[in-house]
């Protein structure tokens, strides 16, 4: 995706919490010599540099993975439409404002490994356990390998070793602080879906912060 300099991520400390909190995205597998890639909406778990998820065995994604294990997970959210008049302040003509959409988007690229209980006992169950522990840590569940042996045969686990991250946070970084704060006021007043999250990103990205000294993957 195209990332303007003003929208570039501030680093892993910014994109990782967004990806972990969202927890849902679209997994894209190009396969080989296909007219279009296979795209699957899915829940996922990001642990370190590894993505874990599971899909029904009949999912067409697995045919694409058999051709090419390289995949991309696209995660987007916290979006809000910004009307043209919101982009102007003071004596500026509201009719000349340029509307836009604020949003966050992260693309994680890596190599997928498929786990099949028929050939790797415990592989799918491990993915399920990790996902459930993250999604409902306070709710006890039976061990899937023991309680649901037949059902677990109908799904396959996927782990993705992430080696590249591209992240974009489009929240008015191309305009000055006064114009961005004016948009925040409008978002807080409108209180529509996504408005609070978008306003939070604008304010957070205005705050001065030390440079990211971690060892983030390419983005």
List each model region and its residues.
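Catalytic micro-motifs at enzyme active sites that drive phosphoryl/nucleotidyl and oxygen chemistry
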Residues: 29-33, 41-42, 61-62, 94-97, ...
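Short, structured beta-strand-loop surface elements
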Residues: 58-127
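An N-terminal domain-cap segment
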Residues: 1-52
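Short, charged/polar surface micro-motifs in flexible loops or helix N-caps
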Residues: 33-36, 44-52, 57-60, 77-81, ...
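C-terminal edge-of-domain segments
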Residues: 113-219
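A general structural signal for short secondary-structure junctions and capping/turn motifs
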Residues: 16-18, 62-65, 148-153
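Short, surface-exposed beta-edge/turn micro-motifs
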Residues: 22-24, 68-71, 155
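Beta-strand secondary-structure signal
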Residues: 52, 72, 109, 157-161
């Amino acid at each position: 995706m195209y990332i303007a300099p003003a929208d570039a991520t501030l680093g892993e400390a910014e994109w990782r919490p967004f990806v972990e909190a969202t927890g849902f995205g679209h997994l894209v597998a190009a396969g080989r010599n296909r007219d279009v890639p296979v795209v699957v909406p899915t829940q996922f778990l990001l642990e370190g540099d590894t993505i874990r998820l599971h899909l029904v065995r009949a999912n067409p994604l697995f045919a694409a993975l058999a051709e090419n294990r390289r995949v991309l997970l696209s995660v987007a959210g916290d979006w809000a439409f910004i009307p043209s008049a919101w982009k102007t302040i003071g004596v500026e003509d509201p009719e000349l404002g340029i509307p836009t959409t604020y949003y966050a988007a992260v693309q994680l690229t890596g190599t997928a490994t498929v786990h099949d209980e028929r050939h790797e006992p415990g592989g799918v169950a491990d993915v399920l356990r990790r996902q459930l522990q993250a999604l409902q840590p306070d709710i006890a569940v039976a061990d899937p390998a023991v309680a649901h042996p037949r059902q677990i045969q109908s799904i396959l686990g996927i782990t993705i070793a992430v080696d590249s991250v591209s992240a974009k946070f489009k929240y008015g970084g191309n305009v000055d602080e006064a114009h961005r704060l004016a948009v925040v006021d409008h978002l807080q007043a409108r209180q529509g879906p996504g408005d609070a999250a978008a306003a939070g990103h604008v304010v957070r990205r205005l705050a001065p912060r030390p440079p990211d000294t971690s060892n983030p993957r390419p983005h």
